[in-house]
Curated annotation (Swiss-Prot):
Record lineage: Eukaryota, Metazoa, Ecdysozoa, Nematoda, Chromadorea
Record's protein name: Uncharacterized protein M01A8.1
Biased amino acid composition, Polar residues: 210-220, 239-248
Chief location bin: membrane
Annotated compartments: Membrane
Organism: Caenorhabditis elegans
Length: 248
């Protein structure tokens, strides 16, 4: 082979993609797709590594539940200001208030501690629950004698009216009262109904004719209207009947 031919074969130009060549467009699409898949794989690998680190850190640290946040445990590293928002002692737990062995709960009531006092140790710090209870009991004993204390439950309050004679009269019989009101309303409707207007007129005429003269009357009292025979009882009769029933 001649050197001229070797130089000619080695200097052959590399084919360049043309603008409208479909093979070049397919090659570019495959390269872009490979780069996109690689980026997604790198992102997922990074997320998985971060999750592993968070899981290891969570397992190392002590887990705190909602109860531990409200009632923090006795941790020597925790300061007093973080336990109960500035108070010395945290609020009592359920097992501290209601112990399994029974007995009175170790809580401060309004009767035992009418006022919160400072502890005898450090005046700048608020007292503990036990110290406040002890101070309140010591102060309440000499001031309030035991004989003057009287606990009255709500169910034992005397609700009797002073004018009532017996405690049974304080209880209202609602059924009988409702029945009396209903009967009275029905009697009024039946008495002053349009169909009984003639009876009312006849009663009024009879009263006016039988009433004495105004000069002979000794008082200004109005004459009583009497109900017709066979009709319903009057208002006064019903009222007297209700009064007698209520007094019984």
């Amino acid at each position: 082979m001649s050197p001229h031919k070797d130089f000619q074969s080695s200097s052959t130009p590399v084919p360049v993609c043309m603008e409208n060549d479909p093979n070049c467009d397919l090659l570019r699409y495959l390269i872009a797709l490979a780069i996109f898949i690689g980026l997604i794989a790198i992102f997922m690998f990074g997320c998985k590594a971060a999750m592993r680190l968070l899981t290891r850190k969570r397992n190392r640290d002590t887990t705190q539940s909602d109860t531990d946040v409200i009632y923090p445990r006795d941790d020597p590293r925790a300061s007093r200001s973080h336990q109960n928002f500035g108070f010395m002692d945290p609020p009592p737990r359920y097992e501290q208030i209601f112990k399994r062995g029974g007995g009175t709960p170790s809580v401060i009531t309004t009767r035992e501690a009418p006022s919160v006092t400072r502890s005898t140790g450090d005046g700048s710090l608020p007292p503990s629950y036990e110290q406040a209870a002890l101070n309140a009991r010591r102060e309440s004993r000499p001031q309030l004698p035991q004989g003057t204390l009287r606990e009255v439950p709500l169910t034992a309050i005397d609700m009797e009216h002073p004018a009532m004679s017996t405690p049974s009269s304080t209880v209202l019989d609602m059924e009988s009262e409702i029945t009396n009101i209903t009967n009275h309303a029905q009697a009024c409707v039946h008495r002053y109904d349009a169909s009984h207007a003639n009876e009312v007129t006849r009663t009024a005429v009879a009263v006016t004719t039988e009433s004495p003269a105004p000069a002979q009357s000794t008082s200004n009292a109005l004459p009583e209207l009497e109900a017709p025979e066979g009709g319903p009882p009057g208002y006064d009769t019903i009222s007297l009947h209700n009064e007698t029933v209520s007094t019984r």
